[in-house]
Amino acid sequence: MRKLLSALILSFSIWSVFSCRQENNVTVKQYPMFWTWLDYRPGMNFDSVCQVMNDIGMDGIMLNAPTPDDYRIAIPIARKHGIEVYAWLWTMNLEHDRDKILAEHPDWFSVNRNGKSLADTTAYVDYYKFLCPALPEVREFIREKIKSYCEVEGLSGIAIDYNRLVDVVLPTTLWPHYGIVQDREYAAWDYGYHPAMLEKFKSRYGYDPREQQDPSADIKWRQFRCDQITEVANMIAGVVHSYGKTMAASPFPTPKMASRMVRQDWGKWNLDIVFPMVYHTFYTEDVSFISDCTVENVRDKNDKTVLYCGMTATDGPEMFECMDAALNSGAQGIAVFTVAGLRSFEVKKRFKAYTDSVRAVRAANGGIIEAVHPHVADTNPFTHKGIMALVEKRMRRIVAEASGKEELPPLALGEYKQTESYDATRCYRVADENSRTVFKVTFYFYGDVLSGWDVVAE
């Protein structure tokens, strides 16, 4: 009885949160509402994965498979379970054909501001082998690859990924893993300096961006590289649409963040549907990041693009907080990375109840879920209660470690005073009267949202 009551309360709360009105005579194309990304490999038990998806209410899958023929095997299995399949394809970063292209076309690879090519150097990880989008032969290679997948019968769409440059700035929670701080753009990670890219820019604007004192501050140069990626995306869209299929993408969290971090101005892409990867655990670690990004995406996406929200799987209550944050802020559906992360019976059961309820709301409102959150993201870090709680927890841990104690002590914080502001970075200083510790607290704003933070003791 208690489980049934919980399901009824969940259904009622969603109806209340999403109650809205739909204008008459508005026709909205219906896409699958709940998705996952998944790697497909020959020999895997794909039927059992599809059964789990069907059981919990997922009806769309972005599938990454090595060859077009693998999709010809997988699609009938997915369809048996009522699941629509998009090919999840890497574009500017090579995947299944990486070694072949490295051997045959080392001149195709992206170059950083220091003149180092990915053909013979590494950026973060070995599999980062990005191509130069300015090269006609690279575009033709991508075009032919996309065509080969579009020819697969029963494939509903193409969802592109890695259609960008190398991360000039990583999400903040990944910095410790690489032993770096990216409070501004640094040359080693600033890619897009292939000779063909530089020549193309110079022929248009009359100068070499490397001549600038700080090339990262050159807005024309930044936007030019974004536009090269946009041209590739829209070339792909033209191919996909010529086959009558849906064009989708999985870009970074918002167009403004993506433009700064990976030169991916995806609000200008000709997408039918977009699944921005709003992975809050990589950024602020607070669910408010999902709300802020989704609000920005409603504003900055292509008007013809249907907005979804991609998020990491959480095998607990936070999964539903994340989906609420996205749907309340204007997303029309959810993509989870990945379904395998939803493991417990209780979470799967609740996920099914959630998907059923949200679909009912969408159907009752003419195919649309309207936003109920404010239309402007909150850029004041001190009003983000969840983020500030995490900041203070980090402070308490620092004090405890310094004193050799396991118990986290209480804080008596004074006033936060801003000490510095540059590029996307704001620095503050605050003292704890109890421990006599002074903390440096830094917030990062890549795009128009609070995208990361850090705390250290001075």
Describe these PLM feature segments:
Residues 23-47, 251:
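Boundary/entry segment of secreted carbohydrate-active catalytic domains
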Residues 37, 58-65, 124-140, 218-228, ...:
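The substrate-binding groove and active-site-proximal loops of carbohydrate-active enzymes
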Residues 43-70, 152-153, 271-273, 329:
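Catalytic domains of carbohydrate-active enzymes, especially glycoside hydrolases
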Residues 87-150:
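Active-site-adjacent "subsite" loops/lids of carbohydrate-active enzymes
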Residues 94-122, 163-210:
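Aromatic- and acidic-residue-enriched segments that line the glycan-binding/catalytic groove
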Residues 159, 205, 220-260, 305-315:
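Aromatic-lined carbohydrate-recognition surfaces of secreted/lumenal glycan-active proteins
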Residues 168, 246-286:
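Substrate-binding cleft/loops of secretory-pathway carbohydrate-active enzymes
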Residues 276-287, 303-370:
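Substrate-binding cleft of secreted/luminal carbohydrate-active enzymes
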